[in-house]
Amino acid sequence: VSRHRQHTQHGRRSAARTVRRRRMLIAAVAAGALVAASGVALGIWATSDGDGTSEGATAASSADRTGGSDEAAGTAGRSPSPSPTRSYPLSRAPRTIPAVREHTAERGPGWRPARSHRVVVADPVLADEGRLIAGELGLAYAGEKDDRRAGDLRLELNRDSGANPESYTMTVRGGRVTVSAPGEAGVFYGTRTLKQEIRGAGSAPEGVVRDEPAKQRRGFMLDMARKHFSAGWIEDRIRELGDLKFNEIGLHFSDDQGFRIESDSHPEIVSPDHLTKAQVKKIVDLAESRHITVVPEIDSPGHLGAVIAAHPDLQLRNANGGAVRGAIDISKPESARIVDDLLNEFAGLFPGGQWHLGGDEYQALVVSDPEASFPGLAAAAREKYGLGATVEDLTTGWLNDRAATVRAHDRTPRAWNDGFFRDTSVKADEDIRVAYWTGKEIGARQPAEYLSEGREVVNYNDEFLYYVLGEPLTFVYPTGQRIYEQWNPRVLRGTTAVSERYDEQILGGSLAVWCDLPRSQTEKQVAAGIRMPLRATVQKLWDPDRPELSWSEFRALAGRLD
């Protein structure tokens, strides 16, 4: 869509629109007085999952009392306007997080929820989306209906196979709202926009929103291995993420400090503080209802301390017999067997199409001469891949084998960027996506190296997107302002963006919470600390261009929408 046709959140006006506004000045002032007289104030915002009968009815009740419906617009205790028609100024674009990408302004009263209004769906597969928004706005969920009534909120699929499956169109016109999309996710995102409009302004402006995300992977990652997080806290984050149009939550649940989910295949490795499978299933179900994919991560061959604690015979040892913390001996078949047991088991618990294999910081590779320091690994590499094979080759083969395990469950694998090596005879499989997090390590490869190989990349840039509890080493807590003003998905390493020609290979990004010093913050403090970084991150993933709102305006908007 050409830029001159867009009406964005910043309220940019064309010269023609300004002229029209001047010509309608007198009528607009009169109309403004009428609108002000019938303004809505929503006192309580629904926070339940919504089934059409929740406490969200308070919102509709408030709208009823303040003239929310068309029928009530001319009442509220005073005589009707003597004018037979009402003139409205052109509507302003809604203000939401993330910002809608296009709004076509129209003249009209907009739409407010009222107790008499219905939510109807044109397709039964949209029942979950319909019930949720009905409960949140205090409307009646009427199910699948063909008739049209005043005040209806209608959800429908348009079956446009060529469109972005997460795109949607929301039309506010004639006292009704229609959300139309090629897929269920797009319909859901349209309802999130509507919910924010009502929350922030009391009404949805007349006109048409056409919206879609720029990036397909919009994520948040949680290190729940180093610090145990309650199921309720994770569920609250999923609701927050859904309202912000995120579509991934990564759960890093295995590391040196703990293994945090119940296991049937290897119960001996599970930490005392952990989530049951029933709790995880509830989390996964809630995420699915918000169109969020849960991306599990069992990191290997490093960061396996909790597994090794129960299986010390699998711990990697150097040439002097010294144990290497967190590193499993990948020359032993038993090591592959136990990790594959876990990957196969948890593939049944996490049905989403993505899987994180880790692959970072294998301690056998941080020494100057891995072959001399770990002769057992060097011998295994030569035996498997031939003379001249290295420990890096053996480690790459391990990554490929684990990728094959999850690929058998129709999962797309990803791994941390320091698990991919240059100049090896064994190459990482082409479909393993690169989770780029750091370039600070000696010899770290530039992002362009992966991209020039044709690899797809997800941005976890630790310069902007790492929230590390206790701020160890050189880490500092990220700020929403810095992300909002300085970062975009092409800024993969440090503060420099890669070439625009790689844009399509960069699938998106993820804000990551790491719990290196787990007692540094409580759950409540973590939630507060990531609040604005989450909002800034999703804004730049939805639309990487420079935002129309200043940071202070964006922060104020976030306060109104919470």
Model-derived features: positions:
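Structural preference for beta-strand elements that scaffold enzyme active sites
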Residues: 217-221, 248-250, 291-295, 354-356, ...
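Active-site beta-loop-alpha junctions enriched in small/polar residues
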Residues: 225, 254-258, 297-303, 360-362, ...
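Acidic, contiguous N-terminal accessory segments
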Residues: 2-185, 193-194, 204-205, 415-420
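Flexible, acidic glycine-rich loops studded with aromatic residues
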Residues: 413-418, 427-562
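Conserved, mostly hydrophobic/aromatic
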Residues: 119, 183, 220, 241, ...
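Feature activates predominantly on carbohydrate-active enzymes
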Residues: 165-336, 344-354, 370, 517
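Active-site neighborhood of glycoside hydrolase catalytic domains
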Residues: 325-431, 437, 442-447
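Soluble non-cytosolic domains of exported or imported proteins
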Residues: 124-128, 185, 228-232, 274, ...
